[in-house]
């Protein structure tokens, strides 16, 4: 059947126009004309009004758009609801996670341990100014040191970038030493404690070591305990705490640093008055080889009121046993500092029968600044494992686990802490 709206079936244009005008005026549907030409067929729908096709299409489009928009809004509401639920689940957790560990800490434990640790770490960031005696004379630049009043001073250059590198290294070590308490001590040198500031501002330019150490300690994570040896040494800066001809501290300077460690860790401090002082005169240290006019030094060391034995393992793996932490045959000359634990060896273990030890064990990861320091720890630990990171060929974490060591002290002189090659050597202990 032909389309009832196809105007091609009308006889002529005039009739088509009339019928179109009729539809517009009376809004009635057009009668259909059959193809057999018998005349128009009456419409049997009793003049029921119909919407034009365009209006139908518009209605359908409007309805479809409303449906699409409604569905989109519902999907958006669903997404927002899901995200909100996830956010509330994360923020409403009962547990807090330490930023430097994968271990979850219950809120009650965090509340009791973190404030104490944070308070101790904050106290380590307070530095006093050493009151250095000054006769207002001027020195001169020697070889690798500034010479003033018969003593050599190694000038320091450091910045926040180097401080960040060192702190990052210590933080990394702590994370790898699972279940072990980690301490860090950075030791200032003679320039900081013996050379007047007026010279460091002029003929002997040297950066602030207090500022450098403070930057390091401030960047350590909360699981590392910084030991502020600086203030203890500063309080005694006009005593014989550094050698004149060498870059190391004296046995007395190391002792004051030890007292800072013992106090920071709430342990009994060894009383030097209960010990026996021994001296070797005529020490000419590392600076004396290249600079004239330096005052010759005296090396003092103290034997303890309890027994200490020493086992040294060399680079070949051979272990030797001694009945003292000091080399009994040490004598005057350029190598006298080596009397402390017999110098730099890969591994040295001190065994103590001090009543304060109570079976505790500690590892000291050090360079040569740790040699004069480590013997004092025998007052507080039954075993002191002294590891020279430059020569130790084992994995530190494995070694601590195998030997039941629960505490590790990283001890570095200020120059070492700001030297990349030293950091690389320490990195090798845990790689």
Regions found by a protein language model. Name each.
Residues 2-431:
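Extracellular glycan-modifying ectodomains
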């Amino acid at each position: 059947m032909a389309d009832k709206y196809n105007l091609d079936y009308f006889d002529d244009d005039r009739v088509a126009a009339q019928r179109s005008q009729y539809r517009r005026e009376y809004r009635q549907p057009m009668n259909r004309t059959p193809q057999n030409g018998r005349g128009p067929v009456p419409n049997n729908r009793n003049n029921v009004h119909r919407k034009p096709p365009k209006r139908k299409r518009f209605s359908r489009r409007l309805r479809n758009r409303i449906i699409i928009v409604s569905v989109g809004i519902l999907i958006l509401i669903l997404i927002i609801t899901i995200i909100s639920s996830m956010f509330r689940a994360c923020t409403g957790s009962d547990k807090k996670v330490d930023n430097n560990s994968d271990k979850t800490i219950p809120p009650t434990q965090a509340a009791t341990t973190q404030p104490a640790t944070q308070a101790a770490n904050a106290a380590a960031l307070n530095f006093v100014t050493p009151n250095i005696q000054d006769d207002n004379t001027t020195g001169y630049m020697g070889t690798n040191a500034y010479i003033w009043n018969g003593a050599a001073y190694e000038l320091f250059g450091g910045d926040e970038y180097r401080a960040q590198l060192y702190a990052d290294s210590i933080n990394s070590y702590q994370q790898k030493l699972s279940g072990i308490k980690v301490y860090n001590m950075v030791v200032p040198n003679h320039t900081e404690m013996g050379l007047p500031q007026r010279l460091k501002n002029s003929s002997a330019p040297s950066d602030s070591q207090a500022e450098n150490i403070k930057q390091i300690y401030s960047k350590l994570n909360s699981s590392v305990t910084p030991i502020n040896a600086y203030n203890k040494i500063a309080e005694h800066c006009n005593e014989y705490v550094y050698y004149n001809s060498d870059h190391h501290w004296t046995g007395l300077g190391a002792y004051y640093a030890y007292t800072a460690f013992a106090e920071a860790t709430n342990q009994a401090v060894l009383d030097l008055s209960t010990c026996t002082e021994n001296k070797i005169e005529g020490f000419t240290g590392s600076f004396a080889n290249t600079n004239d006019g330096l005052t010759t030094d005296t090396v003092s060391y103290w034997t303890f009121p309890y027994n200490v034995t020493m086992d040294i393992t060399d680079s070949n793996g051979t272990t030797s046993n001694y009945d003292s932490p000091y080399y009994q045959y040490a004598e005057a000359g350029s190598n006298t500092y080596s009397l402390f634990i017999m110098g730099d060896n890969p591994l040295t273990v001190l065994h103590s029968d001090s009543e304060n030890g109570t079976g505790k064990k500690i590892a000291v990861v050090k360079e040569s600044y740790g040699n004069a320091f480590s013997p004092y720890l025998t007052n507080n630990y039954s075993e002191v494992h002294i590891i020279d990171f430059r020569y130790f060929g084992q994995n530190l974490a494995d070694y601590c686990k195998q030997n039941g060591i629960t505490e590790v002290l990283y001890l570095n002189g200020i120059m070492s802490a700001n030297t990349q090659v030293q950091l690389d050597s320490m990195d090798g202990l845990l790689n």
